[in-house]
Amino acid sequence: MTELKNDRYLRALLRQPVDVTPVWMMRQAGRYLPEYKATRAQAGDFMSLCKNAELACEVTLQPLRRFPLDAAILFSDILTIPDAMGLGLYFETGEGPRFTSPIKSKADIDKLPIPDPEGELGYVMNAVRTIRRELKGEVPLIGFSGSPWTLATYMVEGGSSKAFTVIKKMMYAEPMALHALLDKLAKSVTLYLNAQIKAGAQSVMIFDTWGGVLTGRDYQQFSLYYMHKIIDGLLRENEGRRVPVTLFTKGGGQWLEAMAATGCDALGLDWTTDIADARRRVGDTVALQGNMDPSMLYAQPARIEEEVASILAGFGQGEGHVFNLGHGIHQDVPPEHAGAFVEAVHRHSAQYHL
């Protein structure tokens, strides 16, 4: 494997010294870039784009050609696992992801296979290998998965949800059925992330997009417990270096201490959490990633720069910060505003690493 030319993202996750704060953006390969839209049109639809290693590689690299980002993230979707389990993923225009065969009973759960990462999910591993090759050691590659709870919400609700009543009904009326589903998903995610690491991912991230809809007690039992299980089962070293793990629960700022206790290397923060407060609470055990409001990218570059400076000052001197948005970049953000954001992070952060 090629020597890594820029490893500041990996170093920051391990709270090691860096020259400037590393930065990348969730959904950095996406619809705000005209070149992404062109490649997606060439692929035909979203899943065809994910399943074509060359095109998935192309869209992964597109933002790196425009901006001096410190990491690439695999272009894929969190719903690849439920799709590989046979639920029939499709995308409804304006509706988001849907499943033709959502989970309705314990019998449905019992029938679910644990997908083979090099079988049904082999297209993801092919994309990882292709991207690693084409990155030529410029920056590290991040692999990822949805969390068991977040995947379960889509599988039981049949798609996106606003109130999560269907899965909460299962959680409160048939908790053992939901635990059986989450257990199967935890095993699947562990295999999936380990396969991504073996294929070349140099860091992995678990996206718990919907953990924040739970009570504190339910979060511990139905989300965090299974993420902890996954972390315990992950390969933490590959190619002679540590493979850092980042845990991100959107809306989970009140549970940072419990999240840090899982043994992950870093926690993702959404924009509702104060980064200075987060660092006081858990900064001696984990790195922090975040956490500008993605909507700030609608502002003029001077205002974006102000916000970047304010978040950097909030984190303060020293190591253990990866700058990012608090969630994915919006699809109608002007690309030059994203560029102003990335450059502002590098320009304003050097003073914190003297």
UniProtKB/Swiss-Prot annotation:
Picking any one GO biological process from the record gives: protoporphyrinogen IX biosynthetic process from glutamate
- EC no. given is 4.1.1.37
* Quaternary structure (record): Homodimer.
Q: What is its main location?
A: cytoplasm
Protein's job: Catalyzes the decarboxylation of four acetate groups of uroporphyrinogen-III to yield coproporphyrinogen-III.
List, alphabetically, the GO terms of the cellular component aspect: cytosol
Matching entries from CDD domains are given as: URO-D (cd00717)
Question: Which pathway does the database say it acts in?
Answer: Porphyrin-containing compound metabolism; protoporphyrin-IX biosynthesis; coproporphyrinogen-III from 5-aminolevulinate: step 4/4
Catalysed reactions, as listed in the record: uroporphyrinogen III + 4 H(+) = coproporphyrinogen III + 4 CO2
Give the enzyme class: lyase
State which gene encodes it.
Answer: hemE
Protein family according to the UniProt entry? Belongs to the uroporphyrinogen decarboxylase family.
Known SUPFAM superfamilies for this protein?
Answer: UROD/MetE-like
**Positions of substrate binding:** R27, Q28, A29, G30, R31, D77, Y154, T209, H327
Q: GO MF annotations for this entry?
A: uroporphyrinogen decarboxylase activity
Q: What is this protein called?
A: Uroporphyrinogen decarboxylase
> What species does this protein belong to?
Enterobacter sp. (strain 638)
